[in-house]
Amino acid sequence: GFNNTINVWQLHVKGFGSWHLSPKTFVNLYAYGGIKLPFKQPYFNQRFLGYGDVFMQGYEYYVVDGVAGGFLKATLAREMLNFNIRIPPRKGKEAERIPVRIFGKIYGNSGYVHNPQPGENNLSNRMLNAAGIGIDILTLYDVTFRFEYSFNQLGQNGLYLHRKTIF
């Protein structure tokens, strides 16, 4: 809102593209950018990277506060398995099935967050890079389980587990 204590204009833009290289192989690009004006914002309004769905793989355990920035995620994925799990029929009903698709992937991320008052956060005002490999399991209602092993420029690596649904 606008009053004497808080004055902020925000613009956040995101885009996604997917291109098939073969029937089971594709490239995904996801870009995100944002800016908050004026740059001098109270700490509460400086939340940027690491909150909710706005994060970079390999930096899941970090938050980077700032007023402007963005990132690009690139993924090369291939469908490895596609099968159905059969559920026994119930009384008066036909047998049902749960579709399962498993994808192998490699990915890379690059991003930057500008913070005019970085304080103790040494991840602001520098390029952040990470890469890794992973497996995505896609099932009913676009429920996705992601198992990702990431490496970041801080010399850290680890296995990260994610779950995403449309609900």
Q: Model-derived features: where do they sit?
A:
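Outer-membrane beta-barrel "beta-signal"
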Residues: 72, 156-167
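Outer-membrane beta-barrel transmembrane domain signature
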Residues: 75-85, 89-91, 95-132
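Flexible, surface-exposed loop regions and adjacent strand-edge segments
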Residues: 10, 44-53, 121-127, 163-167
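Residue-level signature of outer-membrane beta-barrel architecture
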Residues: 17-19, 76-78, 137-139, 149-151, ...
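Transmembrane beta-strand segments that form the barrel wall of outer-membrane beta-barrel proteins
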Residues: 1, 29, 57-62, 106-111, ...
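Membrane-embedded beta-strand positions of outer-membrane beta-barrel proteins
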Residues: 15, 29-31, 74, 104-108, ...
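Transmembrane beta-barrel architecture of outer-membrane proteins
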Residues: 8-12, 69-71, 128-132, 142, ...
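C-terminal outer-membrane beta-barrel translocator/porin domains of Gram-negative envelope proteins
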Residues: 1-94
